[in-house]
UniProtKB/Swiss-Prot annotation:
The lineage of its organism: Eukaryota, Fungi, Dikarya, Ascomycota, Pezizomycotina. Belongs to the DENR family. This is Translation machinery-associated protein 22. It comes from Neurospora crassa (strain ATCC 24698 / 74-OR23-1A / CBS 708.71 / DSM 1257 / FGSC 987). One of its GO terms (molecular function) is translation initiation factor activity. PANTHER family: DENSITY-REGULATED PROTEIN, DENSITY-REGULATED PROTEIN HOMOLOG. It holds the Pfam family DENR_N. InterPro entries: DENR/SUI1_TIF, DENR_C, DENR_eukaryotes, DENR_N, SUI1, SUI1_dom_sf. Keywords: Cytoplasm.
Length: 187
């Protein structure tokens, strides 16, 4: 009896679906570009003008009009979402805050990384490995999350973020020093 082998399936590098299903996602244009670059034979099988014309010819006139309308609507929606994401990234700020805990003890808080598509748990683990300290993801009362690293490593964290995570621009990183109020300073 011969052993059964699985059929190799190609997955899109953009949306992670098989290329035949990319048209149902929101990133059709990017998926087409990726497929044309990485799998030209499959691209010609799915997206060549002849294939598209043949598919359109098999539809009724009303269905063709509806398909064109839907395609335009999807493209506009995807473009708007992409623009919104780019604006969000451009306007978001990564705040690295040095907070005094006790007399000479500090913790460093990093917030705003999630806007750049980074997984906070992985980044926290990287910080812990890099600086040989404890680091964790904590929830902030305002609703977001931040990474808290033990020790005064704010300058090093800024350099590490710029070096390892290229998607975070240098202009969007802000260093803040937070001092604990002395007992006499209060109300």
């Amino acid at each position: 009896m011969t052993a059964l082998t699985g059929r190799p399936v190609v997955y899109c590098g953009v949306c992670s679906l098989p290329p035949e299903y990319c048209e149902y996602g929101g990133t059709v244009k990017k998926c087409q570009q990726w497929l044309e670059k990485n799998q030209p034979t499959m691209y010609s099988r799915i997206w060549s003008p002849e294939v598209l014309e043949a598919e359109m010819a098999s539809l009724s006139v009303e269905a063709q009009e509806r398909a064109m309308k839907d395609a335009k609507k999807k493209a506009a929606k995807a473009e708007a979402a992409e623009q919104k994401q780019a604006d969000k990234r451009a306007n978001s700020v990564v705040t690295i805050k040095r907070i005094e805990r006790n007399k000479r003890k500090y913790v460093t808080s990093v917030s705003g990384l999630e806007a750049f598509g980074l997984e906070l748990k992985k980044v926290a683990k990287d910080f812990g490995k890099k600086f040989a300290t404890g680091s964790s993801v904590t929830k902030v009362p305002s609703g977001g999350e931040e990474i808290v690293v033990q020790g005064d490593v704010s300058g090093e964290i800024e350099e590490f973020i710029l070096e390892k995570y290229k998607e975070v621009p240098e202009d969007n990183i802000e260093l803040v020093e937070d001092k604990k109020k002395k007992k006499g300073e209060g109300n």
